[in-house]
Amino acid sequence: MCGIAGTFSAKGFFSKADIQAAGEKLHHRGPDGYGFFEEEEVMLLHRRLSIIDLDNRASQPMSSHDGRYVMVYNGEVYNYVELKEKIIQGHKGTAMAEFKTTSDSEVVLRLFELHGRNFVSELNGMFAICIYDRQEHKLYLFRDRMGIKPLFWYSDREGNFAFASELKALTAFESISKEVNHESIFNFLRSGFIPSPFTIYKNIHKLESGTCLTVSRSGIEKDKFWKLTKQVDGNKLNNEKEVLVKLDSILTEAVKIQLRSDVPYGIFLSGGVDSSLVTALATKHVNGKLNTFSIGFREQTHNEAPHARAVASHLGTNHHEFIVSHSDAIALIETFFDVYDEPYADTSGIPTMLVSKLAAQHVKVVLSGEGGDELFYGYGTHNWSVRLNKFPFNTFRIPMSILFKQLSSRYKRVAELLKYDSDKTFLPEHIYSQEQYLFNFDELKNLMLNKHVSELNQFSEKYFTSFSSTFSGLQNKPSEELQSLYEIMYPLQDDLLTKVDRATMQHSIEARVPLLDNHLVQLALQIDSSLKIKNGINKYPLKKLLANYVPEEIFMRPKRGFSIPLAKWLKTEWKYLIDDYLNEKVIAEVGLFKPEEVKKMIRQFYSGDDYLYNRLWCLIALHRWLIKNQ
């Protein structure tokens, strides 16, 4: 795991000082080493976090054996041992079979030498890779198929191009435009994050997962080397025994190869199904006790520490635990907002930063359980996607919405879930947004100043059209499968994986996600929906598999999620955030919202409408970012 940055531009447009400033912004991603390459129109920078092959010979930028290619690379390719052996066996007696290091980086570069852009199909791992062809004067950038590792890029009309692992590194360039994208603000208020390929800035983009970007003197070309929506065709697996055997075998192998490391490692253990299963399988491959790390809260409604403790005790791990108070969280708020570089509202990032800090005292690599809920239907959103297509909801949806709205505030979310125009709504996105208690478009139109409403209307039409295009041809898929695909493509990548990457890298540790192993993802996409939710049990295959290692009474309980008691804290210890960022002066300064509507929302929240907490938090996060950065 590392931090990378680079430029491709007319000589002199980007200065060496620019890219060095970017490198300073990435220091936390790679405190173990620094490397720089410059030639004609190209500059490449690398900050190293040493995980595999700690020798300086494995440092980057790394050149190919003949000097034609230069690479900077962030991530890990877990099957590098097998790939290296394949190269050696296939090229015995040639320079291609000779390696100077034991690193995965050299294997990645050698594969590119042999296969060109097609090399990426061989890689099982997480990565953001940049390779410069000195002969053809071309820059190739690749992002892994699940979007685990981040990569941002900038371009202008004159052909100047720059990239970096984090947004803050690109905004360190003085010559890069930092004009805010209003559509990204609308996106944020709908989702709580800004989805790929957008960022908060107009001319800076996230490179989408499974994508290759080719930059040359003649321009930029972008193409997909792996597309999620193309992986769901064909016959589905519905034999439970067969699925469980395959799942056990593939996940066991995924955990095994992701434990490859030359530095100490451990596991984030929440006590939930996914992290417990990863921990159980990891204990089969370690000598001695495995380090596990968890976070708890004093508020018992949000405290899962006892469950993590029970799993750790059963599996015999060396368990580390930290109980979070509101004061611990307050001390992190400013850092939390700054780490993500753009508006971001997932407050589970705060406990993730705290558990990362705890882990960093003991290890340099952690395994985490992201991906299980999205691949195996673990959320309430998947249940709602089924309900909304069945009686009585599909027949009496509108009157039921009106009825639920008249009831107490605890039913407001159900009322909003049922309220949508089927001709203008991409249902999976609507379900996700309302399940998160976020704004629907009618609420946004009522909240925004009149001068922004026409722009919002145009955005809502583009929004629906974009989703319809992305998921075209999948309308006949089960509703829960479509929900899963949406959540893999957007919330998983741009919220959860972003959260884990920034939180861990802030403390210079590497997070790995075995449930997003290439082979496991392919298997999960082939499993029939009827097996993922069976007998009313979400994530049925994962729970059946976990029962082989951990007693069901430890893990069979309602899902809570890795969240903080935000609604309570915003009324007590964190009330100052509402006072500081949602007062009349700030609302007027930002110039997006009607003051009377924001005040009304705050009054309702204090009067008992707790469901408004996430909307208020989004406004706080947005206002805070705009005030600080504009």
Regions found by a protein language model. Give the residues of each.
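Cysteine-centered catalytic environments shared across enzyme families
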Residues: 1-340, 352, 356, 548, ...
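Conserved glycosyltransferase catalytic-site signature
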Residues: 104-105, 124-126, 182, 348-353, ...
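Short low-complexity, flexible loop/linker segments enriched in glycine and/or proline
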Residues: 334-338, 360, 382-384, 569-571
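Short acidic/histidine-rich active-site segments
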Residues: 363-373, 377-379
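A mobile, often basic/glycine-rich helix-loop segment
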Residues: 376-401
